[in-house]
């Protein structure tokens, strides 16, 4: 498994705030299809876009809830009012992954109805929760939801396929706007390929607007990552070879080869973390090697020949 590189949110705050300001507004509650209702979690932010999307799935009185937001009172009040008004109950609570903006609403749910504790499912369950198996199905009137294990954004990330719609709840792996933050690039790219192979037409992301053309969005995400991987391979292949000596490049040197001379702050806070993810993925694929040393002084070299 590739080394996980932390994302420096503070460095990107100004840029991300600008992105947030340009996002389309989403209503607090929206009926997206005959069997899918979106409830915003009331937590807009630079990483959450318009807020975390939580979903009620099904057409009968018992519904499946996907994710719980981060624990804002407005979300719990909205959910409770919606359930009361439409005479609904929660049969299953499925969590896409462990991040707090998806699991933070659990205490309020349990406080309201302690019996819900035994209906909470997560791939790596916390105490009192139940595990989700890859391929496991959850059925209520009007909807069958199948779990698809898709690690990368998080180690326990799950997507959920609604079989009646050929629609995919994409979690944080694919967003309605922009691109996702990745914990493990190798796992993430494998998960993107698996998600694309499902052949779903519509995407319900955990953040942002509905993805009406999911195949096109999947190809965009896959291409986005493939281009950046190829840039690193090309940069390493450009190193002049010396007879009898293995010559490599440090991560900052690779960054300069790809992006030119940029401010040191950008190199340290953005370029180095991202390129490190790419390099560890390529090392797993046996396309690059490295010499031992400190992270930014370690020299990397290609093991493949450019065509």
Curated annotation (Swiss-Prot):
Pathway terms, separated by semicolons: Secondary metabolite biosynthesis; terpenoid biosynthesis
Practical applications: Viridicatumtoxin and its derivative, viridicatumtoxin B, exhibit anti-methicillin-resistant Staphylococcus aureus (anti-MRSA) activity. Moreover, viridicatumtoxin and a C2 acetyl analog, spirohexaline, have been demonstrated to inhibit bacterial undecaprenyl diphosphate synthase, a potential new target for antibiotic development.
Key word Hydrolase present: yes
Cofactor: Zn(2+)
Residues the record lists as binding Zn(2+) 1: 97, 99
Cofactor binding note from Swiss-Prot or TrEMBL: Binds 2 Zn(2+) ions per subunit.
Taxonomic superkingdom: Eukaryota
Binding site for Zn(2+) 2: 101-102
Pfam families in UniProt: Lactamase_B
Function text: Lactamase-like protein; part of the gene cluster that mediates the biosynthesis of viridicatumtoxin, a tetracycline-like fungal meroterpenoid with a unique, fused spirobicyclic ring system. The first step of the pathway is the production of the malonamoyl-CoA starter unit for the polyketide synthase vrtA. The aldolase vrtJ may be involved in the synthesis of the malonamate substrate for malonamoyl-CoA synthetase vrtB. The polyketide synthase vrtA then may utilize the malonamoyl-CoA starter unit, followed by sequential condensation of eight malonyl-CoA units to form the polyketide backbone.
UniProt-recorded name of the protein: Lactamase-like protein vrtG
Lineage of origin: Eukaryota, Fungi, Dikarya, Ascomycota, Pezizomycotina
């Amino acid at each position: 498994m590739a080394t996980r590189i932390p994302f420096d949110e503070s460095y990107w705050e100004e840029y991300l705030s600008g992105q947030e300001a340009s996002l389309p507004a989403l209503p607090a509650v929206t009926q997206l299809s005959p069997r899918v209702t979106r409830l915003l979690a009331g937590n807009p932010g630079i990483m959450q876009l318009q807020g975390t999307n939580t979903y009620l799935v099904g057409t009968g009185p018992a519904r499946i809830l996907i994710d719980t937001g981060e624990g804002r009172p407005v979300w719990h009040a909205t959910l409770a009012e919606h359930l009361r008004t439409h005479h609904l109950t929660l049969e299953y609570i499925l969590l896409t992954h462990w991040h707090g903006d998806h699991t933070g609403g659990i205490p309020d749910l349990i406080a309201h109805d302690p019996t819900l504790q035994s209906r909470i499912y997560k791939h790596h369950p916390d105490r009192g929760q139940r595990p989700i198996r890859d391929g496991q199905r959850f059925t209520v009137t009007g909807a069958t939801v199948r779990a698809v294990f898709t690690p990368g954004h998080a180690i326990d990330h799950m997507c959920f396929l609604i079989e009646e719609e050929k629609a995919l709840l994409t979690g944080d792996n694919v967003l309605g706007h922009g691109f996702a933050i990745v914990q493990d690039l190798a796992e993430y790219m494998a998960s993107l390929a698996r998600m694309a192979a499902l052949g779903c037409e519509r995407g319900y992301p955990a953040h942002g607007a509905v993805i009406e053309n999911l195949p096109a969005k999947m190809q965009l995400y896959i291409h986005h990552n493939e281009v950046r991987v190829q840039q690193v391979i090309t940069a390493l292949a450009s190193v002049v070879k010396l007879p009898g000596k293995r010559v490599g490049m440090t991560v900052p040197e690779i960054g300069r080869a790809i992006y030119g001379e940029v401010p040191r702050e950008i190199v340290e806070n953005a370029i180095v973390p991202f390129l490190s993810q790419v390099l560890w993925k390529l090392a797993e694929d046996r396309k690059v090697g490295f010499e031992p040393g400190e992270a930014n002084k370690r020299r990397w070299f290609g093991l493949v020949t450019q065509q």
